[in-house]
Amino acid sequence: MIKKLENILFINTGGGICDALSSLALLNYINEIFSIDNLFYYSTDMDKFWFENKLSEFKPKNLITIKNFPQHFGFLYEHRKVSKNLINLFNFDKFDLIIDNQTRLKNSLIYKKIPHQQYISPCVNFLLSKPFILTKKNKNVTLRLINYFNRIIKKSFKPSYEIKIEDKFINTAKKIMSKNNKYIGFSITAGHPTRNKEFEIKEI
């Protein structure tokens, strides 16, 4: 595994703000174990670009948000025809490493067409990865990649999940969720705008 990595592409297909936030442990981990100049970040976030606005205070210093990939890149079969040429958007010939943080085979086959030197993906138990190590995929989305990298570098780094939250957010939360107010919170999985969801609220 190359220790000095100039350009990494990190693919996080989850488009929600929590998907971006949950990727921080992994982003910080790879910054810790590798010497990285540019950490390119792509997410199917409907042009929300979370690390450029609402999550800017958590953004790693070397993170560069990709804003010019095709919409929903990787989810459509026709993207296979454009994957290789996407490297022309950058001032280098190939990525030193692509980290594909998802498990859909169709998507991974499309992402892997982007020119690269090394490619890591948990898809099909890391079978598409280069370098490949026979391993059992961890159910934890963050640990499955960290454990794989640890096996490659033959070390046992542990991720840090600690995130420092600014006082302005804590104070706002206290106002919204004061002891005198009752509230109900909804966490709807796969709540992407392209997926229609309906639910009926009934008085309990």
Predicted regions and their residues:
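Catalytic machinery of carbohydrate-active enzymes
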Residues: M1-I204
